[in-house]
Amino acid sequence: MKLSKYVKLVKGGGYCMVAHVEDSGIWLGTRSAIFRATELPDMVGEEQVRTVLDMPEKAWEKVHFDERWEGTVKSIFGMNLSDYADGEQDTEKLKVMAAPDGLWCDCRRSMDDGELIFYREAMLSPLAEQIKESDYIRYTVRKNGERPAVFGGA
């Protein structure tokens, strides 16, 4: 994960979430994305997180910090973020975009039921390098009873 890209999302959105997951290490999130960050050192508390993210104190003052402890990767904020989940559906990228509230969103279609899922491609920027260099990236959708979530996995 490219930490500087995550920091840019935090500064832009004013929100930083750190989840300590017992069976999976540290995850970093924004209001609309969450990233596995197991390559980072264990960090607890605002001061350690700010230091690891290398954010100036003045910029950090504008960020809402949320820290959580979760029991399993299968239930982070009620979502199963394990490598594979029963019932996940493959998707295909479409040449369609939409701009709800002025934010351009890319589109993927579920291969099973044809449902369209719009998401902000910019939220994948911390993973862009890994996505580009990976031989195997699979985009799937998982439904948890609420709204769909799109995942990319290597």
Predicted features and spans:
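DNA polymerase processivity clamps
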Residues: 1-154
